[in-house]
Amino acid sequence: MRIMLLGAPGAGKGTQAQFIMEKYGVPQISTGDMLRAAVKAGTPLGLEAKKVMDAGQLVSDELIIGLVKERIAQDDCAKGFLLDGFPRTIPQADAMAASGIDIDHVIEIDVPDEEIVKRMSGRRVHPGSGRVYHIVYNPPKVEGKDDVTGEDLAIRPDDEESTVRKRLGIYHEQTKPLVEYYGKVAEQGKLTYNKFDGTQSVGAVSEAIVKAIG
């Protein structure tokens, strides 16, 4: 079962990825983890990627596709894999198809931008312990203070509203076109494309995914 997850940052992909991995016994392939592992293992592609990254440049699509192919040939991918965060653009999707990496199911988790902004910009963290709160969904007992220590809570830079909106802008520009791209591939009968309402509870989304992909 070869699955790809699509959705904006903050849509809840990470939670569902965890569920899918456990339910179907497939590994999650995240390009970031894969790059780090290849560099650490010192594979030829890893060494090439290290050279590029050390020079402060972006790793090319070609190199990433090579790493994906190397990764999915490993034993733990025998039953399939879960791609998260790749491909991000149409050229990457084209390159992936051209290199023979097939996908069975594309899962899109759809959450309106304003809901994502509310979810992410409402997060508060206690820096000392890593405890996470949310001003709406999981507020601390005393506003702005950690329940255990009474110390001040902070907003992570990634959760600042301006940062969240910027990341959403990049997503709509680069990755959202993949929704249409894979919709067309699905029409040709080459894979199934399912869109889920990510504003539902985590359990409801997980249940809907199982119903759709079996």
UniProtKB/Swiss-Prot annotation:
Keyword tRNA-binding: no
InterPro entries the UniProt entry points to: Adenyl_kin_sub, Adenylat/UMP-CMP_kin, Adenylat_kinase_CS, Adenylate_kinase_lid-dom, P-loop_NTPase
Keyword Cytoplasm applies: yes
LID as annotated region, ranges: 122-159
Highest taxon listed in the record's lineage: Bacteria
Pfam (any one): ADK_lid
Enzyme class: transferase
Keywords of this entry: ATP-binding, Cytoplasm, Kinase, Nucleotide biosynthesis, Nucleotide-binding, Transferase
Biochemical pathway: Purine metabolism; AMP biosynthesis via salvage pathway; AMP from ADP: step 1/1
Annotated binding of AMP, by residue: T31, R36, Q57, L58, V59, G85, F86, P87, R88, Q92, R156, R167
Catalytic function, reaction form: AMP + ATP = 2 ADP
GO cellular component, one term: cytoplasm
Location(s) in or outside the cell: Cytoplasm
Subcellular location, principal: cytoplasm
UniProt GO MF annotations: adenylate kinase activity; ATP binding
Positions of region (NMP): 30-59
Gene Ontology biological process terms in this record: AMP salvage
Family: Belongs to the adenylate kinase family.
Oligomeric and partner information: Monomer.
PANTHER family the UniProt entry points to: NUCLEOTIDE KINASE
Purpose of the protein: Catalyzes the reversible transfer of the terminal phosphate group between ATP and AMP. Plays an important role in cellular energy homeostasis and in adenine nucleotide metabolism.
Name the UniProt record assigns to this protein: Adenylate kinase
Gene source species: Shewanella loihica (strain ATCC BAA-1088 / PV-4)
